[in-house]
């Protein structure tokens, strides 16, 4: 490792799906490293075995791969400072915890669950009372010899002030009297999240630590550990919370969207990454659409805001729509096919011109889940009201629409080459024959084919999508509906 190399780490716990907040941490961590041509490390923090979810590590790997956040070191790719799974480093933490005990910066705590529970019952906000802080060396050795269960706690000063620097929130000072003697090693011998973080960040040469601002209150305790060991303190980048609305945080516990949920809701992964990048970071320009490569180039963590960010679904939809428009037709069609399969039978998939349908749908949706409802008219002609034949701008009404359809039917029946160009010629010939404006013919034909007031595509496109047989059937239905209503 180069002395000046920027090294960042994403250190998730394998507890389920990748929440939006976690993904933002991963993204910012990646961008900080890559902006400086540094290394992005993946570390799995599985010391809380009670929260471990089977398969969650694979979700982490898959999400990083899908989003393009490729890690340079990690459990699956190796590296010079492994292992990269905390449970595989168990012996390392105990060694460092004992060093702190020897330095008077930590102590063995033998308080049992019953005593700790009674403290919690008698206090609104639980804080360990330091009962074991000053046990004599002999008392400690006797308890250890007798196999009394213990944890190792950090020994924080009871007075004075601890000050630290954060790149987003500036200089922060905390009274030491507010610092709890947090547990470093649990009774099962595994480290706590807080202690393992500090030890691993040092041993792995981490230069920048990105996390949520809920960890600001823990930073003084982390710094006291760094100072106790004589280690360099990394650069802290504490990010503001992501809010569901003005009053509520986006929360995994409340069932708010995970990365997987957003994909299932019809969002493109590239759009999600772009959107999440802007949840707290301001590029300093009006640009809103960024590729990952552009983000690497432009990202400066000093432009992260202090104030919370609102997860604006309307904006995410808009952004996703912009990404959808940029897809090639073949790419879009590939994404659209599973949604067509939701409503069309195998036979219908082969009958209708779905590639043509995709061409019409692509510019009309913001998320892919809008497709089934938008194209439902293709599967089944809606039982529509003839009022939709009336259009002020097109100068149509039920009477002249009936004239148009009755003229159009034989012309369409006679058409052998059912292609866009041929359909175009027939319909335009009809316009000339009737000596009317285009809309007087286009609107009734489009309405008869779709059965809706608005549709993806006009008369020619819909006829091409539906095919000759179904198009003629729908024109006949339109004629019957209009005749019945007028007469």
UniProtKB/Swiss-Prot annotation:
ATP binds at residue 252. PANTHER family: GLUTAMATE--TRNA LIGASE (PTHR43311), GLUTAMATE--TRNA LIGASE, MITOCHONDRIAL-RELATED (PTHR43311:SF2). Keywords: Aminoacyl-tRNA synthetase, ATP-binding, Cytoplasm, Ligase, Nucleotide-binding, Protein biosynthesis. The keyword Lyase does not apply. The gene is gltX. This is Glutamate--tRNA ligase. It is found in: Cytoplasm. GO terms for molecular function: ATP binding; glutamate-tRNA ligase activity; tRNA binding; zinc ion binding. The lineage of its organism: Bacteria, Bacillati, Bacillota, Clostridia, Eubacteriales. CDD domains: GluRS_core (cd00808). A motif ('HIGH' region) lies at residues 12-22. Its main location: cytoplasm. It catalyses: tRNA(Glu) + L-glutamate + ATP = L-glutamyl-tRNA(Glu) + AMP + diphosphate. The keyword Cytoplasm applies. Pfam families: Anticodon_2, tRNA-synt_1c. Monomer.
